[in-house]
Amino acid sequence: NTNKKLIMKGDYDYLKLLNISCVRIMKYDYLIVGSGLFGAIFAYEANKKGKKVLVVDKRPNVGGNIYTENIDGINVHKYGAHIFHTSNKEIWDYINQFAEFNRYTNAPVARYKNELYNMPFNMNTFNKLWGVVTPEEAKQKIEKEKNEAGIKEPKNLEEQAISLVGKTIYEKLVKGYTEKQWGKRATELPSFIIKRLPVRFIYDNNYFNDIYQGIPIGGYTQIIEKMLDGIEVRLSCDYFENKEELENIAEKIIFTGPIDKYYGYKFGELEYRSLRFETEELDVENYQGNAVVNYTEYEVPYTRIIEHKHFEYGPSLGKIAGGKTAQKTIITKEYPDKWIQGKEPYYTMNDEKNTSLYSKYKELADKDSKVIFGGRLGQYKYFDMDKVIIEALKCVKEELK
């Protein structure tokens, strides 16, 4: 009976051409949908415990959004900049078993018109804005602006931001960037989006407070490749386009795509913000002098420019393998984009409306013994990379007891 014949990988495409349907192509313990960090970690840990795993990904490469591609000796972050940071030594040690990390420190620069400011807001920023030198002078300046605004009960994001840092910082470094990111004017955005704005009264441009920080030497893709070594992976394989084959191929599914899409948008669409990237290779050795430059003017359509070589070269700028000099550079302009079905969802919109909608899908998922949802889309929450690892290892511990 060909419908129930067990066949080996590689035969499926042939049978598909002959229009022969197979109930069981191969039997797996877990089908993992998505080869990003969450899916790859689960696959790696399950494989170590002797579980039979199949990983599928709709993209032609592994790695999800942390995928990096080496172009002319430069590791390009294809889906936006990713800087690993954590204060959890266990998580730092875990990720370091797959790659050696450099000592990159995230110190973005904000550009407003032709003025450049250090981020996050610190004494270097305040000195450039007002000429103040001491922390006390900076505090007085910010408090004066907050008092002048007189906002006691912020009604929108604009009022909330001004009540936290004053008008000058808000107008130059917050307003335009935030409006581009959300696709709405700040006066139309709810105040709860900005609960706090970090202000540091020290001369320190390190964006993160975490103890451990860096970029893997050689890029992120190698990490995922090592995790998936020896595991069957099918690329350019969209779960939804191959659902008939895949839905009964394994005992359980680890699903890292959008939870609402998995359930056919039963309760309606969750909202996201998307991104669009424009990448250029330039015939200059050093374009902007920093890995990340944020553009805070609303009139500039992109939110930031990434110069990828600066993530890894640091003091030895321009040096690639063998000590040769990279005479070119690669930059990426990042444009916030409205999300519609068919576009890549990057940022979850965790407002009251969407949180309420997600809770309905979560309730459905909790009753579903066939599937486990993971990652930012499966759990509808923005995660830094260290938090993804924590969630994935938690899932492994609970599932593979």
Where are these regions (language model features)?
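N-terminal Rossmann-like FAD-binding beta1-loop-alpha1 element of flavoenzymes
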Residues: Y30-V55
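Active-site/ligand-binding neighborhood in enzyme catalytic cores
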Residues: K113-Y117, M123-K252, T256, K261-Y263
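Extreme N-terminal leader/targeting segments of oxidoreductases
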Residues: K4-Y30, K48-K49
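Glycine-rich FAD pyrophosphate-binding loop
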Residues: N47-I71
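Short, well-ordered alpha-helix to beta-strand connector turns
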Residues: Y28, G50, I231, I249-E251, ...
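C-terminal catalytic lobe of FAD-dependent flavoproteins
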Residues: E344-K401
